[in-house]
Structures are given as C-alpha cells and as structure tokens.
UniProtKB/Swiss-Prot annotation:
<dbReference type="GO" id="GO:0009252">
    <property type="term" value="P:peptidoglycan biosynthetic process"/>
</dbReference>
<dbReference type="GO" id="GO:0005975">
    <property type="term" value="P:carbohydrate metabolic process"/>
</dbReference>
<comment type="function">
    <text>Cell wall formation. Catalyzes the transfer of a GlcNAc subunit on undecaprenyl-pyrophosphoryl-MurNAc-pentapeptide (lipid intermediate I) to form undecaprenyl-pyrophosphoryl-MurNAc-(pentapeptide)GlcNAc (lipid intermediate II).</text>
</comment>
<dbReference type="GO" id="GO:0071555">
    <property type="term" value="P:cell wall organization"/>
</dbReference>
<dbReference type="GO" id="GO:0050511">
    <property type="term" value="F:undecaprenyldiphospho-muramoylpentapeptide beta-N-acetylglucosaminyltransferase activity"/>
</dbReference>
<protein>
    <recommendedName>
        <fullName>UDP-N-acetylglucosamine--N-acetylmuramyl-(pentapeptide) pyrophosphoryl-undecaprenol N-acetylglucosamine transferase</fullName>
        <ecNumber>2.4.1.227</ecNumber>
    </recommendedName>
</protein>
<comment type="pathway">
    <text>Cell wall biogenesis; peptidoglycan biosynthesis.</text>
</comment>
<keyword id="KW-0997">Cell inner membrane</keyword>
<feature type="binding site">
    <location>
        <position position="298"/>
    </location>
    <ligand>
        <name>UDP-N-acetyl-alpha-D-glucosamine</name>
    </ligand>
</feature>
<keyword id="KW-0573">Peptidoglycan synthesis</keyword>
<dbReference type="InterPro" id="IPR006009">
    <property type="entry name" value="GlcNAc_MurG"/>
</dbReference>
<feature type="binding site">
    <location>
        <position position="197"/>
    </location>
    <ligand>
        <name>UDP-N-acetyl-alpha-D-glucosamine</name>
    </ligand>
</feature>
<dbReference type="Pfam" id="PF03033">
    <property type="entry name" value="Glyco_transf_28"/>
</dbReference>
<dbReference type="GO" id="GO:0008360">
    <property type="term" value="P:regulation of cell shape"/>
</dbReference>
<dbReference type="GO" id="GO:0030259">
    <property type="term" value="P:lipid glycosylation"/>
</dbReference>
<keyword id="KW-0961">Cell wall biogenesis/degradation</keyword>
<feature type="binding site">
    <location>
        <position position="169"/>
    </location>
    <ligand>
        <name>UDP-N-acetyl-alpha-D-glucosamine</name>
    </ligand>
</feature>
Length: 379
C-alpha cells in the first residue's frame, strides 16, 4: 500500500462471505482516507472478495463454525478456535492495533476474544435486524456495538449501541447517483436476480419457470441479469435460451452495483448488505428471505424495508412459479408503483454509514466511551 498511515493500525475481522466483507471493505476505504493502516483478519473463503486489501494486509485466521452437538466435531471446532486465538495474538503482537472491529461470522471470534483479552479496544458491527450468533457471543465483551438494522434503544446492550447503518462500497455510492427511470410500456424491462454473494439455487429454478408462464409479448420485453451458483449456471442459462430471453447468468458479478442501478426491478434475498445496497441505490424490489436462516435475520431485514414501502416481501414457500409470474407481470406494467417503491427505498438508505462507523471506530480507538461519543465528544 503506497499511502501508509501515521494514525496507527486498525484490524477488521470478518467472516469470508460478501455479506460480512463488503461493509468491512467500505469501512477500510473510509479509514484509509483518514490516515489509518487497515488490515483484514478473515478465513480462507474470502479470497474472491478481498481485492480492496493488499495481499500482505490480509491475514487468514484459523476458525470453525459451531454446529451440531457431536462431541468429536465440537472438540475439533473448539481446537480450531483456540488455534485461531493463538494466530490472532501473534498477529496483534506484531501489528499493535489500536482497535479491532468485528463484522460477524464465526471467524471473528478468535480475533475479538484475543483483542479483548489483550486489552485492545474492540467494536462489533451487526448488519442485520437480529444479532447473529457470533456477535451475540461477543456483545458482552466489546467496548461498542454498531448497528445496521438493529432496532434503536432495544436489548440488553442498548447503552453501548450506536445505529450507524451498513457501510456500502464506493461503487454503490457511484451507482446511487443514477436516478431511477421506469421502463416505458414497450421498452425492454431489465430484471436483476441475485441471492447474495453465495447465490440462491431456488432462484435458478423458480425464475426461468415463472418466465416461461409469461405471455409471449411480455417475455419479449425481458432482459435478465441473474446470479446463479456455479452448479446451476448452465441449466439456468439453457432455460433462458430455450425461451428466447436474453440473459446474462454468472456465479458472481464484480460490477453488481452498476447492474443494480441499471435495473428496473430487483428480485433478491434479503441479507443486510443486499438490502442496504438496494436502499442506497434506490430500486424497487421483491425480497425472498432465505427460509433456513437460524436467526430469521433476513425476514427481519426485509420487513424493515417493506415497512417503508420500498419492497414487497414474499416467503419462499408461498412463491410458486404461477404467483411469481403474476408478480413479475404486475411489476412490468405498474410502472408508477415501481417508481414510488424506488423513492421509498432510497428514502431509508444511509449512504453516509461508512463515515458514521469510522467516526465511532476512531472514538473507541482513542479511548472514548460510547456515551461520550453519543454526547458529541468525538476525536
């Protein structure tokens, strides 16, 4: 990195999925602009998402997910977490960070536990409306909690919680400058479908099946961009080719914010990063929460946007191809409704979340309390 800081080192710890890493990337960008040297502690899954960090600033920490009750499996898990704790201590002794910030996921447990035990100030950011298990386990130990969709003034840790919103990456802020323009009745209708950074098998089956049920003149208007898991990519692409519908299908799009800005309608899961980007860019959406989420966090995230009038929320179990086709046809023809949804979504977006979170991070790094931060006593 060619503009290393004089403020000191801050380590960001995040699980290796886009939902955890994208807000970490956004905070890193803001902190670097303020003169901080920012490092990332993560797991091996993160390689395709960490382009915003120099290679020597990415540190893979051993970790494991706590799942099931098998004694042997649990023993292996706790052994991995202990090894991660040792990895983290060694890293922190070398880097001497002034703050460690966790973004959720089990890979954050070793760095945050190590930091708190070493007397290094700690902060966690919870993206969702319901606190995840890893953050829940850390909430009592850290100096401060930043919330994306957490309800304000609720829960046992309200006194040390600050609602900052979810930081979004620079390309999202660039895309947010593109105003929403409804498709004309005879125009191509650009549909964006994605299931978060890990894709969604359900969409790869359900969307082509629904498109097949549309009247031919409606099908002819569609231009589809769809994220699909690698194992579903070929079958989804073939389904659209058979229907004569132009479709760009891939496991991952590096330019997803630009594609969202270009879309007339979005069908997506409702992870926190997804919902945050939809609101900052301001696009009408149908949200289908992942039904197997242990904490039902996606349902809570979706409900927050639906309450503002910015999205329709449909349970996956209720979304037959027939119903999906009806909702898609309605979206293609109720252009005024989509325009109102886009405005409602944008009205609840927080494009300044990275700045607010960076303000909090600097305050905690300097030794200030959350109460002092809330009272305006900032660095």
């Amino acid at each position: 990195m060619d503009n290393l800081a004089n403020q000191g080192v801050i380590v960001l710890a995040a699980g290796g999925t886009g939902g955890h890493l994208f807000p970490a990337e956004a905070l890193a960008h803001e902190l670097r602009a303020r003169g901080w040297d920012v490092h990332l502690a993560t797991d091996a899954r993160a390689q395709r998402f960490v382009g915003a960090f120099a290679q020597d600033h990415v540190h893979v920490i051993r970790s494991a997910t706590i799942a099931g009750r098998n004694p042997v499996a649990l023993l292996k898990t706790f052994w991995s977490l202990w090894q991660g704790n040792l990895d983290s201590r060694k890293l922190f002794r070398r880097l001497k960070p002034k703050l460690v910030v966790g973004f959720g996921g089990y890979p954050t447990l070793p760095p945050l536990y190590a930091a708190s035990n070493m007397g290094i100030p700690t902060l966690i950011h919870e993206q969702n409306a319901v606190m995840g298990r890893a953050n829940k386990g850390l909430a009592g130990r850290v100096k401060a909690i930043a919330g994306g969709f957490l309800p304000e003034n609720s829960g046992a840790y309200a006194a040390k919680t600050v609602i900052t919103g979810n930081p979004v990456r620079s390309p999202v802020l660039v895309a947010a400058a593109t105003p929403y323009t409804p498709a004309g009745k005879d125009d191509r209708f650009r549909l964006l479908v994605f299931g978060g950074s890990q894709g969604a098998q359900f969409f790869s089956q359900a969307i082509p099946a629904a498109v097949a049920l549309l009247p031919e003149h409606e099908r002819a208007r569609l231009l589809i961009t769809q994220q699909a898991r690698k194992e579903d990519e070929a079958s989804a692409r073939q389904a659209y080719e058979k229907l004569g519908v132009p479709a760009d299908v891939a496991p991952f799009f590096n330019d997803m914010p630009a594609r969202m800005a270009d879309a007339h309608f979005v069908i997506a899961r409702s992870g926190a990063s997804t919902v945050s980007e939809i609101t900052v860019i301001g696009r009408p959406a149908m949200l289908v929460p992942f039904p197997h989420a242990l904490d039902h966090d996606q349902a809570a995230n979706a409900a927050a946007l639906a309450a503002a009038g910015g999205a329709e929320v449909v349970r996956q179990a209720d979304l037959s191809p027939q119903r999906l086709a009806e909702m898609l046809q309605s979206a293609m023809n109720e252009l005024e409704r989509l325009e109102q949804q886009a405005k409602a979504a944008k009205s609840v977006g927080k494009p300044d979340a990275a700045r607010l979170l960076a303000d909090l991070a600097e305050a905690i790094a300097s030794g200030k309390t959350v109460q002092e931060f809330k009272e305006g006593n900032r660095p």
